[in-house]
Amino acid sequence: MAGPAPWNTNGKTCLMAGSGKFGEPGPYKVARKDVDLGMIQANQNSGMFTIFYPNPLEASCLHPIVAWGNGTGVNGADTYAFFNTNAASWGMVVIAAHESNTGTGAHHKKGIDYLIAQNDDPMSMFYKKLAVTRVGTSGHSQGAAGALAGAGHPSVSVNVGVGGPSTTDAKHAGLCLTGTEDIASTSCPAAPDRAKGPAFAASWQGGDHVSTETVAGYITKDAGTLAMQRLYAAWFRCFLADDAVACNLFKGATPNDCGVCKEKMMWAVLKGANIP
């Protein structure tokens, strides 16, 4: 199996021009498809996945892959659908596990392997439509830990943790998203300080780990939602699709000079390192 592509290289990844406002719907319409991948681990509740994908899929370019994992106790694909629908509207094909125990990374890896196989299957709607060396993992809480474990898949080069850890090694571009009241991801703001590869940390003022509206207080449907899903989509768009506009949100002449760093929003922490 081919290894992950280096960051910011010229490739045939889909880069349909959009507004550049990554918290808002991108240039692609989005459809959903459910698949049952059966038994993946002993303590699982579900083998179901939902695929969020651009509709129609491009014929002349390849769509990057993202695998998502839910937080503890969250079943199905609807709780975090706004995150993954938005990413798909910006060109990603996101496969989201319905499972609530995703911390091992097994569901992330299974989802990635499924889409890679679909890319090789002449009978599949995804046949020759996917950038199988442009792959990312993501998740919330326990799912973020699973995304970190799932980043061990040989095709993965990008990782996003929401309310949980993200990668800091030299092989992956890692983004962690958290809130100032989130006691479950207190290490996130300092992640870029120990990163050997591209890394960025963003902490929303007043954001917590859980709330009554959705599982993550800082991804409720308010300004925090748009801010978080904006960086989520932009990170993948930057490192999986070579989008210079997206990359400029995270980089600058100094750590405090990045595009999003200059904005007057409710961010308590915005910090990057090694952004190419």
Summary of predicted features, one role per range:
Residues 3-61:
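N-terminal cap/lid segment of alpha/beta-hydrolase-fold proteins
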Residues 61-71:
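Short beta-strand element of the alpha/beta-hydrolase
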Residues 77-96:
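Short amphipathic alpha-helix adjacent to the substrate-entry channel of hydrolases
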Residues 170-234, 238-240:
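Active-site-adjacent alpha-helix of alpha/beta-hydrolase-fold enzymes
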